[in-house]
C-alpha cells in the first residue's frame, strides 16, 4: 500500500498561487501551525482562506494576512486581528463575514456534496444581500450555498499510518468537517502511531478522507 506519510517540504508541492484553502482552528487552537508556516515560507500569494477566524497577528492564519499573502478571507470573526480589519478597510483584501453556524454548515454541505441549505439566520440584514430567499410555511429563509476548497490543512491529536484521526478537546473544532470539503486534505498530527493502536470508537475522521500525513520532528 502506498504510504500517506510526507515531510513538510513535500507538502509545499501542493501550494499554488490563487488557491482556495480551508484551515482548521479556533483562535489558533487546533490550527496546523507547521503547515501554515510552510505555506507562508513557500511564497505563494493571492490565496482565498476559509477559516473560523483570523486569530491574532502572530497566531493561526494571522501571519499569512500580515505578510500580504491573502486576497480573500471567508470567516466568522476577525476582531482579534487588527491587520485583517485594516486590510479590509483599505481594500487590500476582501473579507466575507459569515455567521459561525452558517459557515460550518456551508462547509459540511460542501463535504457532503449537497447543493446548499436553508436558514433564517441573516434574513433582513446585510447577510441577505445578493442571496436567494424562499418563503416556506410563511417564514423567509436564505439559501446558503456550499463551500469547498482546493486544499484543506487540518490538525489532529493522534493519527495512525492510514490517516485515521482523533482530536483533543477544543482543538477538534472545525477540523473534522474541513477534512471532508477539499480536493486534497493534509493533516498535521501531534502524535503518529501505528495502524491498530487507535481505539475504533475514538476515531473521528476516517483515513479514507485523508490524502497525506505530515511528519516532522515534532510528531512523536
UniProtKB/Swiss-Prot annotation:
Signal peptide: none
Residue ranges the record marks as coiled coil: none
Organism of origin: Escherichia coli (strain K12)
Pathway named in the protein's UniProt entry: Lipid metabolism; short-chain fatty acid metabolism
Reactions catalysed, as given in the entry: an acyl-CoA + acetate = a carboxylate + acetyl-CoA; acetoacetate + acetyl-CoA = acetoacetyl-CoA + acetate; butanoate + acetyl-CoA = butanoyl-CoA + acetate; acetoacetate + butanoyl-CoA = acetoacetyl-CoA + butanoate
Annotated Gene Ontology cellular component terms: cytoplasm
Protein name: Acetate CoA-transferase subunit alpha
General function of this protein: Coenzyme A transferase which is involved in short-chain fatty acid degradation and catalyzes the activation of short-chain fatty acids to their respective CoA thiolesters. During acetoacetate degradation, catalyzes the transfer of CoA from acetyl-CoA to acetoacetate by a mechanism involving a covalent enzyme-CoA compound as a reaction intermediate. Utilizes a variety of short chain acyl-CoA and carboxylic acid substrates but exhibits maximal activity with normal and 3-keto substrates.
Pfam family, one: CoA_trans
Induction notes from the record: Transcriptionally regulated by the regulatory protein AtoC.
Gene Ontology biological process: short-chain fatty acid metabolic process
EC numbers, comma separated: 2.8.3.8
Record has NADP as a keyword: no
Oligomer status and interactors: Heterotetramer composed of two alpha subunits (AtoD) and two beta subunits (AtoA).
Subcellular location: Cytoplasm
Molecular function per GO: acetate CoA-transferase activity; butyrate-acetoacetate CoA-transferase activity; CoA-transferase activity
Deleted gene: phenotype: Mutant lacks acetoacetyl-CoA transferase activity.
Major localisation: cytoplasm
UniProt keyword annotations, A-Z: Cytoplasm, Fatty acid metabolism, Lipid metabolism, Transferase
Top-rank EC class of the record's enzyme: transferase
Activity regulation note: Inhibited by p-chloromercuribenzoate.
Family of this protein: Belongs to the 3-oxoacid CoA-transferase subunit A family.
Keyword field contains Metal-binding: no
Annotated binding of CoA, by residue: 24-30
Amino acid at each position: 500500500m502506498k504510504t500517506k506519510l510526507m515531510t513538510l517540504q513535500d507538502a509545499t508541492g501542493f501550494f499554488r498561487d490563487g488557491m482556495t484553502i480551508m484551515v482548521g482552528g479556533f483562535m489558533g487552537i487546533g490550527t496546523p501551525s507547521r503547515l501554515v508556516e510552510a505555506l507562508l515560507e513557500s511564497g505563494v500569494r493571492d490565496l482565498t482562506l476559509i477559516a473560523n477566524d483570523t486569530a491574532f497577528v502572530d497566531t493561526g492564519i494571522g501571519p499569512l494576512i500580515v505578510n500580504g499573502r491573502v486576497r480573500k478571507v471567508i470567516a466568522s470573526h476577525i476582531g482579534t486581528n487588527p491587520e485583517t480589519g485594516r486590510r479590509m478597510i483599505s481594500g487590500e483584501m476582501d473579507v466575507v463575514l459569515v455567521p459561525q453556524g452558517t459557515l460550518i454548515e456551508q462547509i459540511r454541505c460542501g463535504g457532503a456534496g449537497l447543493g446548499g441549505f436553508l436558514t433564517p439566520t441573516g434574513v433582513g440584514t446585510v447577510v441577505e444581500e445578493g442571496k436567494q430567499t424562499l418563503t416556506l410555511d410563511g417564514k423567509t429563509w436564505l439559501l446558503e450555498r456550499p463551500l469547498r476548497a482546493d486544499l484543506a490543512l487540518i490538525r489532529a491529536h493522534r493519527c495512525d499510518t492510514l490517516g485515521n484521526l482523533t482530536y483533543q478537546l477544543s482543538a477538534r473544532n472545525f477540523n473534522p468537517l474541513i477534512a471532508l470539503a477539499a480536493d486534497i486534505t493534509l493533516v498535521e498530527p501531534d502524535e503518529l502511531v501505528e495502524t491498530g493502536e487507535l481505539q475504533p470508537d475514538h476515531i473521528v475522521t476516517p483515513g479514507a478522507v485523508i490524502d497525506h500525513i505530515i511528519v516532522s520532528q515534532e510528531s512523536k
